[in-house]
Amino acid sequence: MTFTTTPRRLAKTLALAAGMSVVSLSAFAGDAALYGPVAPKGSSFVRVYNASNQEVSATVGSTNLSEVAPLASSDFSFMPGGDYSAKIGSQTVPVKLAADHYYTLVNNSSGQPQLIEEPPFKNKQKSLVRVQNLSDKALTLKTADGKTDVVKSVAAKGRGEREINPVKVSLALYDGDKKVGDVKPVALERGEAAVLYVTGSGSSISPVWVKRPVSTR
């Protein structure tokens, strides 16, 4: 049996195919608008945490990381791995970014900016509490009453972390058995990393949670 394709049937078929293409392209465009551009394989990811009391702007190479308010952070921006010049405020530092790695560029209230590596968190069932201790003393993150260790002793200039169940919790930093500062309550969400950046020295330390901006999650 043979089928004859009439001009009218052929026109309908082409019109249907064209319509489906338009729908597919529209859906793709909608996804791009919703999720933003997809980072190419081998990209590096960088954000800024501004630990100072003044707004700063930052660039890494030719990538603008936007204006960042005091004690706030930008979202991650991606770029090819490699060697770059990072400018934050009036200071410029060389940085080396490895492919498929995440980093936070910290603007300190005094001293040069610091590039801190942020290993990605991939457990969708738990929350991650990470302490980036940029202070000059070892610190332990505990529950506010001091009874339970959440992240045990993190060395000065070191990093410590722990996966926990999603919860809203009040915490504090301890130097041994001595409380050195309360930490703002934080709501820990499933699949999310909450990073506590501790800057300063001596008795003047500043603990601030750094999380991705709500509008970009």
From Swiss-Prot:
Domain of life of the source: Bacteria
Localization of this protein: Periplasm
InterPro entries from the UniProt entry: AlgF
Pathway: Glycan biosynthesis; alginate biosynthesis
Keywords linked to the UniProt accession: Alginate biosynthesis, Periplasm, Signal
GO BP terms, alphabetized: alginic acid biosynthetic process
Signal peptide: 1-29
CC per GO annotation: periplasmic space
Sequence similarity: Belongs to the AlgF family.
Entry function: Together with AlgI and AlgJ, forms an inner membrane complex which probably interacts with the alginate polymerization-transport complex and adds acetyl groups at the O-2 and O-3 positions of mannuronate residues. Acetylation of alginate is important for the architecture of biofilms and increases the ability of alginate to act as a defense barrier.
Name of the molecule in the record: Alginate biosynthesis protein AlgF
